[in-house]
Amino acid sequence: MSSEYQIGHEGEFSFRGHTLDELQEMELEEVAELLPARQRRSIVRGLTEEKHKLLEKAREAGEEETANDPIRTHLRDMPVVPEMVGLTFAVHDGQNFERVKVEPEMLGHYLGEFQLTRSSVEHGQAGIGATRSSKFVPLK
């Protein structure tokens, strides 16, 4: 099974045969041809106005080198494109914003995949009143 991305002998990242520098120089439509079908379709059909604004913010933040300030967004369905690599996004999970630092290995995925909307439930020990049968458990 071949991987979409590889790290070569020199430690250089490549995505479907292209280095990160080559990908960042490509137009969005050229990058879309390398993405998986679902992400490619969303780009080819046209990004929404909100997604274009997010890309503009990412371009400005990349030029200013202000990677410390996260870009806040509710757009969990935005595909990760090469312009976003190295930036920090604050992705909304339904309750609050959580930081996601975009790495090269995230190319072709959605922002929402890296911030889960549900947390795992950790139940405590059963005690008095936890269940109907625990009413008869003697106290220590």
Swiss-Prot record:
Gene: rps19
Originating organism: Haloarcula marismortui (strain ATCC 43049 / DSM 3752 / JCM 8966 / VKM B-1809) (Halobacterium marismortui)
UniProt keyword Transmembrane helix, yes or no: no
Protein name per the record: Small ribosomal subunit protein uS19
GO cellular component, one term: cytosolic small ribosomal subunit
GO biological process, one term: ribosomal small subunit assembly
Domain of life: Archaea
Similarity-based family: Belongs to the universal ribosomal protein uS19 family.
SUPFAM superfamilies: Ribosomal protein S19
